[in-house]
Amino acid sequence: MTKVVNNLQDIFLNGARKNRIPVTIYLTNGFQLKGFVKGFDNFTVILDSDGKQMMIYKHAISTINPAKPLLFVQNPNGDDYKDKE
């Protein structure tokens, strides 16, 4: 059974992950992390940066900025989202 993505946070992170779009993650303490989203759950994001993986707690994230816009449309079967471009 396929999990239906139903909130903007999951749609955004899943789009960045599936389309391998580089992101810059700004933390609440001012640090910037650049890399690719490899996975996420309700509390964390896994970021691949220069071949190293980091687990970042979502409560420490201020902003996530993708290298290119993520525009989403729902597939006709209703179980996935993909980049519109």
Swiss-Prot record:
Matching InterPro entries: Hfq, LSM_dom_sf, Sm
GO biological process: regulation of DNA-templated transcription; regulation of RNA stability; regulation of translation, ncRNA-mediated
Residue span, Sm domain: 10-70
CDD domains named among the record's database cross-references: Hfq
Alphabetic keyword roster: RNA-binding, Stress response
Alphabetized GO MF terms: RNA binding
Annotated TM spans: none
N-terminal signal peptide: none
One cellular component term from this protein's GO annotations in UniProt: cytosol
Keyword Heme on entry: no
UniProt family annotation: Belongs to the Hfq family.
Subunit structure: Homohexamer.
Protein task: RNA chaperone that binds small regulatory RNA (sRNAs) and mRNAs to facilitate mRNA translational regulation in response to envelope stress, environmental stress and changes in metabolite concentrations. Also binds with high specificity to tRNAs.
Name of the protein in its database record: RNA-binding protein Hfq
Species the sequence originates in: Clostridium botulinum (strain Hall / ATCC 3502 / NCTC 13319 / Type A)
Organism classification: Bacteria, Bacillati, Bacillota, Clostridia, Eubacteriales
Chain's gene name: hfq
